[in-house]
Curated annotation (Swiss-Prot):
It comes from Pseudomonas putida (Arthrobacter siderocapsulatus). Regulatory protein of the TOL plasmid xyl operons. XylS activates the xylXYZLTEGFJQKIH operon required for the degradation of toluene, m-xylene and p-xylene. Disulfide bonds: none annotated. Keywords: Activator, Aromatic hydrocarbons catabolism, Cytoplasm, DNA-binding, Plasmid, Transcription, Transcription regulation. Residues 231-252, 282-305 bind DNA. This is XylDLEGF operon transcriptional activator. GO terms for cellular component: cytoplasm. The gene is xylS. One of its GO terms (biological process) is catabolic process. Transmembrane segments: none annotated. InterPro entries: AraC-bd_2 (IPR035418), AraC_XylS_family_regulators (IPR050204), Homeodomain-like_sf (IPR009057), HTH-like (IPR037923), HTH_AraC (IPR018060), HTH_AraC-typ_CS (IPR018062). Residues 214-315 form the HTH araC/xylS-type domain. It is found in: Cytoplasm.
Length: 321
């Protein structure tokens, strides 16, 4: 497959020792370990770009490297084979992925992958909160156990998807996109995956035309920096607290408290990724949104996005510099 997905502007390593590439990937893309072949001196290459909540990565280890991951915890991996092949083992199965195929790893999927010497991949790391949000935005029902996809897919299932990724890469490398634009692209990718790939999400429309739910969600969006009580939400929805829980479980796949917390975290991340926001400190913005326990805030943020808020802010300042 010959597609321009990240160019020299995003180059991190070329002719590099595979362990150096692996260390970088562990920091930004996903926890794993590698095993090198006994003979030869593989030379790895890596391109990487952060685009809002997405990590975009083009990687080649330059040798028959085995990659083992215990799981991604809070993120999904889309791995598109560009060159060579990759042997995947999981769920008691194995398959040789070739160019034109896509491997999709769920947050709790363990991965055992063996690259061919000429294998090159393009990887998108997508936080689970983005897919949860896409479910809510499209009025689809998220299963209680979380969204899960099958592992094996063909890009022909995703009409125009590779062109969308090319557009995202171009946007990431050539423009200073506003956080809203970055969030929009991430939402499109998530919706595209949910719409066109097999998953356990029911796309039956639940909340369309439900004025109570829409009224509550709008109130939350307008008051993210305030302390929002469940009693106030129940009053707005004109129902009991128990019915409010059922409403959120049905239309958002989570509790009102978790929904509010996730929206606060998403808003904070957008600010940290926005150079024009002039964020002075993590503590200040956390307190602005009502997170009084800073240690718990940092842990919630990392669970949602796979990195600490200080990492997000540092990367934003690095890109501006």
């Amino acid at each position: 497959m010959d597609f321009c997905l990240l160019n020299e502007k995003s180059q991190i390593f070329v002719h590099a020792e595979p362990y150096a590439v692996s260390d970088y990937v562990n920091q930004y893309v996903g926890t794993h370990s590698i095993r090198l072949p006994k003979g030869g001196r593989p030379a790895g290459r890596l391109h990487h770009r952060i685009f809002g909540c997405l990590d975009l990565c083009r990687i080649s280890y330059g040798g028959s490297v085995r990659v083992i991951s215990p799981g991604l915890e809070t993120c999904y991996h889309l791995q598109i084979i560009l060159k060579g092949h990759c042997l995947w083992r999981g769920h008691g199965q194995e398959h040789y992925f070739a160019p034109g195929e896509l491997l999709l790893l769920n947050p709790d999927d363990q991965a055992d992958l063996t690259y061919s010497e000429d294998c090159e991949k393009f990887i998108v790391k997508l936080p689970s909160v983005v897919l949860d949000r896409a479910c809510s935005d499209n009025n689809w029902h998220k299963p209680r156990e979380g969204i899960r996809f099958a592992a094996r897919h063909n890009l022909q299932q995703l009409d125009g998807f590779i062109n969308l990724l090319g557009l995202v890469c171009d946007e990431a490398e050539h423009t200073k996109s506003m956080p809203r634009v970055q969030e929009h692209y991430a939402g499109i990718i998530a919706s595209k995956l949910l719409e066109m790939l097999g998953s356990n999400v029911s796309r039956e429309i639940f909340s369309k035309g439900n004025p109570s739910f829409e009224r509550v969600v709008q109130f939350i969006e307008e008051n993210l920096k305030r302390n929002i009580s469940l009693e106030r939400l129940a009053e707005l929805a004109m129902m009991s607290p128990r019915s409010l829980y059922n409403l959120f479980e049905k239309h958002a796949g989570t509790t009102p408290k978790n929904y509010i917390r996730n929206r606060k975290l998403e808003s904070i991340r957008a600010c940290l990724n926005d150079p024009s926001a002039n964020v002075r400190s993590i503590t200040e913005i956390a307190l602005d949104y009502g997170f009084l326990h800073l240690g718990r805030f940092a842990e919630n943020y990392r669970s949602a996005f796979g990195e600490l808020p200080s990492d997000t802010l540092r990367q934003c300042k690095k890109e501006v510099a």
